[in-house]
Amino acid sequence: MRVVAAMSGGVDSAVAASRALEAGHEVIGVHLALSQSPEAVRAGSRGCCSLEDSADARRVADKLGIPFYVWDFSDRFKADVIDDFVDSYAIGETPNPCLRCNEKIKFEALLDRSIALGFDAVVTGHYARLHDGVMRRGVDANKDQSYVLGVLTDEQLAHCMFPVGDTIKPEIREEAKDHGFGVASKPDSHDICFIPDGQTQAFLGKKIGLRPGLMKDQDGSTVAEHDGVYGFTIGQRKGLGLPREGLDGKPRYVTDIDAATGTVTIGQRDDLRVGGITADRLKRLDPAVHGREFECEVQVRAHGGVVPATARLVDDPERTTPAGRVKKEDESPWRLELDLHEPLQGVARGQAAVVYQPDADGDILLGSGTIRATAPWSDAGAAGTAGERATPAEA
């Protein structure tokens, strides 16, 4: 096959490209120029968009003897990832930009261009396993990236290859060393690529501006003022501008964010326990495939744990989410309702709920949805039905 190897400049994509070549495919290397901000592209910046990363990717391609190109998707990245990130925080959501980038850039923009140019597939260094259309977690549990691929469609997966998913990270580094790749010991990137200094609140403040509001406790009493709800996320404990502990001597956490009123509610850790989740913008979840109700496991963070749940797929006629975002006409007509069998802590609107089917050969990824509402956990059991759930905006 003729394939495009997406080369970030890291060790995983380098080995993925090498394995695709060794498998007999015709390979070209492509580095994506995504962010044009001076902070992101400067030499020495640790992200996936810096000049250093592009140079590292080119050196690997030269070592492999494959053609190398830089494709500029910066305008689309700004519109589909950065602006979406800012808009989501402005309405009190907590988005994951890596999922959005995978959905709109790496496996839409890149894949569409690749297919248009006559290529058959895109190769990446993600730690996930894909065989015959079935995606499983990567063998390396510490590096598994199936969660951030949960937004892909069946059509996109039909043109994807993940050559490193069957291998653990130390072996990938050894393989890169054997090939003489200079990136063999290059550290992994953990920061948001367009916020390489890690100062997310400052970045959002510049984009959104001051939107003062009140911080209240569980009984509605005002305890402080704030500059904007974008500076907070559900479950946050640090950076609240409050004494570390309340009058009861217990730590305080952000338990709710109401962007419409500018109110941030704080409470105790137990107030963060969630027993029910409602999600929309579904990917790969369809009653015709999975049935109206099924048992599963759900994960809500890239490196978070999983809990068992009962899932239901129900009609979703609503065109506006509780946070105020108008749904697009091409979005799934279904919504996902999850009754958790164990509580999850600090689940936020805007996060992805990725659903798996437990399997001895590796959990199978069924699909995902974007969380739009939660219901509290009850010590007597999970939350009530979706019809009984109060969304944060209604609580």
UniProtKB/Swiss-Prot annotation:
HAMAP family: tRNA_thiouridyl_MnmA (MF_00144). The active site is at C101 (nucleophile), C193 (cysteine persulfide intermediate). Its EC number is 2.8.1.13. InterPro entries: MnmA-like (IPR004506), MnmA-like_C (IPR046885), MnmA-like_central (IPR046884), MnmA-like_central_sf (IPR023382), Rossmann-like_a/b/a_fold (IPR014729). It comes from Corynebacterium jeikeium (strain K411). CDD domains: MnmA_TRMU-like. Belongs to the MnmA/TRMU family. Residues 143-145 are annotated as: Interaction with tRNA. This is tRNA-specific 2-thiouridylase MnmA. The record marks H126, Q351 as: Interaction with tRNA.
